[in-house]
A protein has these predicted regions:
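"…together with the soluble PPM/PP2C metallo-phosphatase catalytic core" -> "…together
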Residues: 2-168
């Protein structure tokens, strides 16, 4: 148990400090290349660099890889691959105008590592009903939950940085 607590503290610290270090570097990099957009939440012509999620992504991946070194199991590997695929979909969606169907369908395919690596348990334990095995329903839930979660996080980011507090 103590080993898991130490790993959690280290992984959390790596995520925090990676984002803390990379965000100013990313801001300068994006501003030099004039990759800025008007901030719709501020009065005047305040420009902000975009896409800023790259530093959050780097922090998440750094922490997930560190976690994998502590606990080399297929579930963590599936999360790493799913995160990379999901980020790729987000970058494509930000950079190119795609149809409304693109993001949900692409994010559904991002669930493939979870399914292919068997990073799930289709047995559910209910206090009142006991153990229930629902493999087909669980597979469908995994495929639908990745796009739902991705679009929900994207939707709640109505103010700059709200989603970053949700994800870290």
């Amino acid at each position: 148990m103590e080993e898991k607590i130490i790993a959690a503290i280290i992984v959390s610290a790596i995520a925090f400090f990676t984002i803390y270090v990379f965000t100013p570097i990313l801001i300068k990099f994006l501003e030099k290349r004039n990759l800025t957009v008007k901030d719709a939440n501020k009065i005047g012509n305040v420009m902000i660099p975009r896409p800023g999620g790259i530093s959050i992504f780097i922090g998440i991946i750094a922490s997930e890889i560190t976690l994998y070194f502590f606990f080399p199991i297929s579930e963590i590997l599936a999360i790493i691959i799913t995160s990379i695929l999901g980020f790729s979909v987000g970058i494509i969606d930000d950079r190119k105008v795609m149809g409304g169907w693109f993001k949900p369908v692409a994010l559904a395919f991002c669930a493939a590592p979870i399914l292919l690596l068997g990073a799930y348990d289709s047995n559910l334990d209910f206090p009142l009903f006991g153990s229930v095995s629902i493999p087909s329903l669980y597979l469908a839930l995994v495929v639908f939950m990745i796009p739902i979660t991705g679009n929900t996080i994207n939707s709640i980011d109505v103010l700059n940085g709200v989603a970053s507090g949700f994800t870290t």
